[in-house]
Amino acid sequence: MSTANRTFTGLLGTKLGMTQVWDENNKLIPVTVVQITPNVVTQVRTPEVDGYGAIQIAYGQIDPRKADKPSTGHFDKAGVTPRRHLTEVRTADFAEYALGQEITVGAFEPGTKVDVVGTSKGKGFAGVMKRHNFKGVSASHGSHRNHRKPGSIGASSTPSRVFKGMRMAGRMGGERVTVLNLVVHSVDAEKGLLLVKGAVPGARGRIVFVRNAVKGK
């Protein structure tokens, strides 16, 4: 089934951190707590005008004085105050949404599977052993100041270059990461909290995007 024919729910939230809770079988379950205050619909895209169906949602209150004129006009058209973060969710039921409509964490149900998209923690410049899990060079037997080096990165005059994609040292982390098929443990609609089994990308306080599982059954 194509994405255009599927119904999706996606919300922006803030990762608060991890904790442990007991389930109905008295098992200790590690969960990540995501705070999802109401997201508002700021635009509805239709196949007739835009070529596809989707909704644009906004999250995170900001001081209206800090919004530029184009953004202020965009939010005024939707009848909402300016927000800091915007994203689009492609869904087949886009016609059921209206400008200014609020979507709460209650859109997710316990036991269902979700995908979580976030930005991984930045590690700075890292070597190949940390960045790519290289084994390294022997501690002895002729190894002289080579213990954490990558070794050869290519041949000689043929091909006289380093191939693209060669795993080398460089900046690590700070990338978009998607974790698939995490199970929703519980939902606290009053406090706007979503508890997801397992870990999600990013540091505490970072923005994450939670959606229905694309590949989940």
From Swiss-Prot:
One of its GO terms (cellular component) is cytosolic large ribosomal subunit. One of its GO terms (biological process) is translation. The keyword Ribosomal protein applies. Keywords: Ribonucleoprotein, Ribosomal protein, RNA-binding, rRNA-binding. InterPro entries: Ribosomal_uL3 (IPR000597), Ribosomal_uL3_bac/org-type (IPR019927), Ribosomal_uL3_CS (IPR019926), Transl_B-barrel_sf (IPR009000). NCBIfam families: L3_bact (TIGR03625). This is Large ribosomal subunit protein uL3. It comes from Clavibacter michiganensis subsp. michiganensis (strain NCPPB 382).
